[in-house]
Amino acid sequence: MVKNYEEIYGKDELYWGAAPSEIIKRFGELAPVGAALDLGMGEGRDALYLAGLGFSVTGIDATKSGVSKCLELARKKELDVKALSADVRKFKIAKNRYSLIAAINLFQFLPKAEAQKIINSAIAGLKRGGLFVCESFTVDDPHYKAHKKSSKEIAPGTFLDSSGNIYSLYDYGEILKMCCPQFGNTKAQAQLRPVHYAEYDYYDTTHGPAHWHGVVDFVGKKL
């Protein structure tokens, strides 16, 4: 079951902590400083980090409590962050505007077709040389077997649970081909050059009891 993040982010503590995600910390500085977009930003840990690097950041999250917390932290730290409570699927990404677009732990909560639309819009929204950074969960994640047993699989790797929540887990190489279709179809025009791609098991100690995830990371540079 998908957690109630509106309620979680409404608490005083930072659920994910104050430190940025490892992939943003590792690759954020490789993007040319300019406008950045954080899709599904949560409480804004990556948005705040990028603003600290000098980016002018727009963060989008469905939760009002997450947005409120991010804006308060940005005010206290005097950082350039604009945060909006909105459905990322309906947010219109301006073309050729951003130096970096991030979607960290977003795509597991969307049908894969909708994730693909966001990826396509993000690629169009990047300036030449800009970076697209995303992270999600793979079929090696324990949630995959759990959903296979208890949820309805409405598309390969995408499940509808008993509460009506969507959960998607990505097969080997799937995110790479979604971001860089030239790897699945040699006739497809390349728009991103992969900078980093990894699938791995991750022991998560950042929130709640320690647990395992199957993770996929992708970083691509706009050609």
Language model regions located:
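Conserved acidic residues
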Residues: G34, S99
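A short glycine-rich, Lys/Arg-flanked "PGG" loop and its adjoining helix->strand segment in the class I
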Residues: Q116-R128
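Class I (Rossmann-like) S-adenosyl-L-methionine-dependent methyltransferase catalytic domain
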Residues: M1-A31, L37, G42-K92, L110, ...
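Short catalytic micro-motifs in class I SAM-dependent methyltransferases
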Residues: N105-L106
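A conserved beta-strand element that flanks and buttresses the S-adenosyl-L-methionine
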Residues: A102
